[in-house]
Structures are given as structure tokens and as C-alpha cells.
Amino acid sequence: MTTIGTPLTASATKILLLGSGELGKEVAIEAQRLGVEVIAVDRYPNAPAMQVAHRRHVVSMLDAPALRSIIEAEKPDYIVPEIEAIATEELIKLEAEGYPVVPTARAARLTMDREGIRRLAAEELGLVTSPYRFADTREEFLAACDAVGFPCVVKPVMSSSGKGQSVARDAASAEASWDYAQTAGRAGAGRVIVEGFVDFDYEITLLTVRHAGGTSFCAPIGHRQEKGDYRESWQPHPMSQSALAKAQAMAGAVTEALGGRGIFGVELFIKGDAVIFSEVSPRPHDTGMVTLISQDLSEFALHVRAILGLPIPAIRLYGPAASRVILGEGDSTSPRFAIDPAALAQPDTAIKLFGKPELHGTRRLGVALALGRDVEEAKAKAIAAASHVKVEL
């Protein structure tokens, strides 16, 4: 039995979001639909989820005392991390004091950087991964590149969405990869992971939801990235039954080890029927935005249901679907969007604008979504819809 109170009253059921970007915004909307009181926290004002929350707080979530002060004042029923850059050691303490962290404080800690989750997957669970080394200094990094071999992928251990990520194709380009990882990662300079190249046919995100009734899987999501950042995704991605079964077993193993309830974005490489673990996020995944149109329960609805202990009897796929990012480039503190009617002229299309208040450089500002008779048609419709939305600075 789940009991939900009334927002802004003494009986309110409260979710506190740590991170208030576009993914957090959709979580907030789903929570609001169930009468949950939402508090949004982020490091900058007017973040997307703040625009649909009951209250907001602007603070560095790496500032442990400030984070604790907000949580003790708000007394949320659930603390829901939506990004990696959080004072996770403080979350572990708060969880021990009785504040539920989604899915668990340990999961947030292990996945806040690539080292924790890679060591769990490869060294504790014995999952197949790419070869890897960690490095703290330029000298250790160059030695790691030699050990793993060229070409190799270089990533800050604490970063996401491709920030600070590059490919070192030889010893000459390795120096530039080190410098880029030190300056472009979300958490500044620090430790990096050097990964050997994986020979794969394709990569997928397998959305895996742990809920009161067990573990469920969404249809596999294919995606394309540029410079490590998501640009388009589609669902379902075709794969053999053997590969799908192995992917689900691997996703089930790693999410069980992390524990708790909620949705996990498990990233996997597929080569024939072989499956190789890449990463996992204990929260909604950016490539999963396609589920806003592809499924009866989006990844955000699944996350909120799981958090609240509500049933998830089935996850129904409406049909082949795709998403295409709407990008802004330049500098603005009040971007606008010119939407040509052609953007939504086709049936089974939609656009979502995130409401991000500022643009500096290249930033994801929205997404176009489409259903089709097959994935290729859905992708073409999503691409066309996105092309008819122009960002004005």
C-alpha cells in the first residue's frame, strides 16, 4: 500500500531533486501528476525542473554543509539525484540518518565517477568490459595509454554527456586528450580513465527499472553521439534474442548490485551475440527521452512509480520511435525559438523545449520526437521536425 499526501500541507509526500535539468523536469512533472510535492535543487537559478517545482534552491551540490542544510530544512521523503556532481559522502551520512536516497546512497556514490562503477562491474561482478587503466598525472596517463594501446578513449572519471571526452589515436594526440580531460570535465581537473577501443557492431541503452514487483526492461534503445554527447536515439534497436537475453542478464546483475528502486540507464556494446558492459546511470538517461513518445510509461513515469512503490505490471511500446536533439549554439541569456508549422505537420510528432535560461557555446535546448512505421521513418520524421525549430539568440 502506497500513501501519498497533499502538496503544501502537513501530509505532503516530498521529492527533493538534486539536479534540475531537462531530465529532472520530466521527473518533476510525473511526480506532480501523482500529487507529490517537488523541491528542485541546482547550481544555477531557473533551471528547467525549478520551473515546474513547488520550491527551488540554488546551491553547489558539491557543498556538503549547504546540501545538508537544505535537506534538513525540507525533510523530503525521497532524495532523488539527477546528476553525478553531488557530495555523495554526505548522502551516505544522510541515508544512515533516515533520509531515503534513490536508488541508494551507495549507488549514487559508485556511479558519481567512472572508477567506482567500472571496478564494481569488472572486478566484483566479473562482467566483460573494455580494457582500462586509471591515471592521476600526465606521466601515469601516458603509461596507461601505452598499456591499453592506441587508439583509446580518454574520459574524466567524474563527468557525463561526453564532457572532457576524446579519442587519443596516437602518442602525439594523447597529450591533447589529457589537456582536454583536465579542462573540459564537469568537475575540473582530476583523475581520468583510459579505455581501449571496443570492436562492436552497435551500442544500446537498456533502461532497467527495479520496482516493488521485481525488475523490468524497456525495449533496447539505439543512439548516435557527437563528441560523446547524445544527438539522436531510437527504439527499438534490432538485436538477436540471444544478445538481448545476455544484455538483460548483465543489466539485471549490475542493477541488483547497486540496489534500491528506480530506473537505471545501462549502456552496453554489442558484437554479434556478445555483450560488453560500458556504463550505468542510476537515474533516467538522456537517450531515453525517446520514451516520451514510444512507451505508455516513459522512463520518467517508470522512475516515479518505482520510487513511490507503485506497480509496473507492463511496459508497452507504441511502435518504432525516434528522438532528435534541438541544439543551440552561441551566447544568450534569453534564447527564443522560431517554430515553423512544418515542425509538427506530420502526425505522431512532438517537440519538447526544456526552458534552459542561458546558452554559452553548444547546448541541448529541446528534443523532437516521432513515431513511424519503422525506425528509419521515425528517425527521418524526428530529424525533419527538429530542423524546423530555429534557436534565436
Curated annotation (Swiss-Prot):
Pathway: Purine metabolism; IMP biosynthesis via de novo pathway; N(2)-formyl-N(1)-(5-phospho-D-ribosyl)glycinamide from N(1)-(5-phospho-D-ribosyl)glycinamide (formate route): step 1/1. Homodimer. Mg(2+) binds at E267, E279. This is Formate-dependent phosphoribosylglycinamide formyltransferase. It is an enzyme of class 6 (ligase). N(1)-(5-phospho-beta-D-ribosyl)glycinamide binds at E22, L23, E82, D286, K356, R363, R364. Residues 119-308 form the ATP-grasp domain. It catalyses: N(1)-(5-phospho-beta-D-ribosyl)glycinamide + formate + ATP = N(2)-formyl-N(1)-(5-phospho-beta-D-ribosyl)glycinamide + ADP + phosphate + H(+). InterPro entries: ATP-grasp (IPR011761), ATP-grasp_carboxylate-amine (IPR003135), ATP_grasp_subdomain_1 (IPR013815), PreATP-grasp_dom_sf (IPR016185), PurT (IPR005862), PurT/PurK_preATP-grasp (IPR054350), PurT_C (IPR048740). It comes from Solidesulfovibrio magneticus (strain ATCC 700980 / DSM 13731 / RS-1) (Desulfovibrio magneticus). ATP binds at R114, K155, S160, S161, G162, K163, G164, Q165, E195, G196, F197, V198, E203. Keywords: ATP-binding, Ligase, Magnesium, Metal-binding, Nucleotide-binding, Purine biosynthesis. Involved in the de novo purine biosynthesis. Catalyzes the transfer of formate to 5-phospho-ribosyl-glycinamide (GAR), producing 5-phospho-ribosyl-N-formylglycinamide (FGAR). Formate is provided by PurU via hydrolysis of 10-formyl-tetrahydrofolate. One of its GO terms (cellular component) is cytosol. Belongs to the PurK/PurT family. Its EC number is 6.3.1.21. Coiled coil: none annotated. It comes from the Bacteria. One of its GO terms (biological process) is 'de novo' IMP biosynthetic process. Disulfide bonds: none annotated. One of its GO terms (molecular function) is phosphoribosylglycinamide formyltransferase 2 activity.
